[in-house]
């Protein structure tokens, strides 16, 4: 049976920790979409691991890992990340990671184009990670991309890469890019990559009867190409639909869909953010929460928890349970606010706006809670939480239509987690 872990907000919710926890009993852990633009940090046995393209199930010694068909794979990053895990003691990681032969190749050329496209937007930049994800997915949709399986065939990458480079040069002029160097590197990858490449359908068939398959979502619903705050989104489907499509999952095999919700809100890059706090409150969240992007190092914008957004996210992903993260970051706030509705020109909106221009103008309507002003760091039992923290959590559950908050993060370590019987 399949468990899917998905971000319910703008990403950076802390999906890696619950994935790490669940992967200890999983047979298989998979990435379904996205690329090395994702970033998960996991603290395990006092060692900090940063994951980007690799599934974080690699930390679990008995868990096999798959990078699925819906992803885009930057091979230099793949091998660099794998080497970093080995250096930190995961010596057998290379034996437990596989890539679908139908996944797309993300080239250095795509990163160059990403930067040029962002620059051309001037004051309306999307705020991408600059990793080339958007241009790679664009080439996939235009049917001119290169698949992982084609890297193993002599001459295929060179022919296609020369065509891609010529097309982008015709569009942008001379590029700050070494075509011959990248072609040469892929000639080396032709042999180096071979042990990792699999036919996803055949590979997954071996695990169909597995009691525990874990899907690790990347980014989050509000960055989904269809359902997010378009155009300030990533270029893949980040919700449950993307997981099913990217891994060819049987929908009837899905046992649970876990929505990961940070106890406050953050966003990296441009785009509307109705509950953003451009003030001392936002600065305090940023400082205490160490809100810097794992992938880019950029400062994350911070604000109050937005239940309008979370309800919208739930209506698309249909969460069966919630993992609330980073509760401890709110320990020292005198009062805590939660957005429960949007108003535009004094009138409550009935649905989540599709247009970014409307989202930029809405006024958030808040419910205010007294803070608990005591530490929750490291608490592992519900009954040990301060009463005001319990009320805050129960309110979120009600606002989510009764979806239970089963896990509550109270610190960075794997052990800093409350698991409730719900």
Swiss-Prot record:
GO MF term set: adenylosuccinate synthase activity; GTP binding; magnesium ion binding
InterPro entries named among the record's database cross-references: Adenylosuccin_syn_GTP-bd, Adenylosuccin_syn_Lys_AS, Adenylosuccinate_synth_dom1, Adenylosuccinate_synth_dom2, Adenylosuccinate_synth_dom3, Adenylosuccinate_synthetase, P-loop_NTPase
Catalytic activity: IMP + L-aspartate + GTP = N(6)-(1,2-dicarboxyethyl)-AMP + GDP + phosphate + 2 H(+)
Binding-site residues, Mg(2+): 12, 39
Entry's localization field: Cytoplasm
Keywords (A to Z) from UniProt: Cytoplasm, GTP-binding, Ligase, Magnesium, Metal-binding, Nucleotide-binding, Purine biosynthesis
UniProt EC number: 6.3.4.4
GO process annotations (BP): 'de novo' AMP biosynthetic process; IMP metabolic process
One Pfam family matching this protein: Adenylsucc_synt
Active site: 12 (proton acceptor), 40 (proton donor)
Record: residues binding IMP: 12-15, 37-40, 129, 143, 219, 234, 298
GO cellular component entries: cytoplasm
Cofactor: Mg(2+)
Cofactor note: Binds 1 Mg(2+) ion per subunit.
Residue positions binding GTP: 11-17, 39-41, 300, 326-328, 409-411
Pathway(s) this gene product operates in, as recorded in its UniProt entry: Purine metabolism; AMP biosynthesis via de novo pathway; AMP from IMP: step 1/2
Enzyme class: ligase
Binding of substrate, residues: 294-300
Transmembrane segments: none
Role this protein plays: Plays an important role in the de novo pathway and in the salvage pathway of purine nucleotide biosynthesis. Catalyzes the first committed step in the biosynthesis of AMP from IMP.
Family statement drawn from the similarity comment of this UniProt entry: Belongs to the adenylosuccinate synthetase family.
HAMAP family: Adenylosucc_synth (MF_00011)
Subunit record text: Homodimer.
Record's protein name: Adenylosuccinate synthetase
């Amino acid at each position: 049976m399949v468990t899917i872990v998905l971000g319910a907000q703008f990403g950076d919710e802390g999906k890696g920790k619950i994935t790490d926890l669940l992967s200890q009993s999983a047979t298989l852990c998979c990435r379904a979409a996205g690329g090395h633009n994702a970033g998960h940090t996991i603290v395990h046995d006092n060692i900090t691991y940063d994951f980007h393209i690799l599934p974080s199930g690699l930390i679990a010694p008995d868990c096999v890992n798959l990078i699925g068909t819906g992803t885009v794979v930057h091979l230099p990053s793949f091998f660099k990340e794998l080497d970093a895990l080995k250096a930190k003691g995961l010596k057998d990681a290379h034996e437990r990671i596989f890539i679908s032969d139908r996944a797309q190749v993300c080239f250095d050329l795509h990163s160059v184009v990403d930067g040029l496209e962002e620059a051309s937007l001037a004051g309306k930049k999307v705020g991408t990670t600059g990793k080339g994800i958007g241009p790679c997915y664009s080439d996939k949709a235009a049917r001119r991309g290169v698949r992982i399986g084609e890297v193993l065939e002599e001459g295929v990458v060179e022919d296609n890469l020369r065509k891609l480079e010529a097309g982008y040069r015709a569009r942008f002029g001379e590029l700050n890019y070494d075509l011959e160097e990248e072609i040469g590197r892929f000639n080396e990858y032709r042999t180096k990559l071979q042990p990792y490449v699999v036919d996803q359908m055949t590979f997954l068939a071996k695990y169909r009867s597995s009691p525990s398959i874990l899907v690790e979502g990347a980014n989050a619903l509000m960055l989904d190409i269809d359902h997010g705050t378009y155009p300030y989104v990533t270029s893949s489907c980040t919700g449950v639909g993307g997981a099913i499509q990217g891994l060819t999952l049987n929908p009837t095999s899905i046992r649970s869909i876990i929505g990961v919700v940070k106890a406050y809100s953050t966003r990296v890059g441009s785009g509307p953010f109705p509950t953003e706090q451009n003030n001392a409150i936002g600065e305090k969240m940023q400082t205490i929460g160490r809100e810097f992007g794992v992938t880019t190092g950029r400062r994350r914008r911070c604000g109050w928890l937005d239940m309008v957004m979370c309800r919208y996210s739930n209506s698309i992903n249909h969460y069966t349970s919630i993992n609330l993260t980073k509760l401890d970051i709110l320990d020292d706030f005198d009062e805590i606010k939660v957005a429960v509705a949007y108003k535009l020109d004094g009138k409550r909106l009935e649905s989540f706006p599709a247009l970014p221009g409307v989202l930029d103008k809405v006024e958030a309507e808040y419910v205010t809670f007294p803070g608990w002003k005591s530490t929750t760091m490291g608490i592992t039992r519900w009954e040990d939480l301060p009463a005001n923290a319990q009320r805050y959590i129960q309110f979120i559950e009600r606002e989510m239509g009764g979806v239970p908050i089963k896990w509550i993060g109270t610190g960075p370590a794997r052990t800093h987690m409350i698991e409730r019987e719900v």
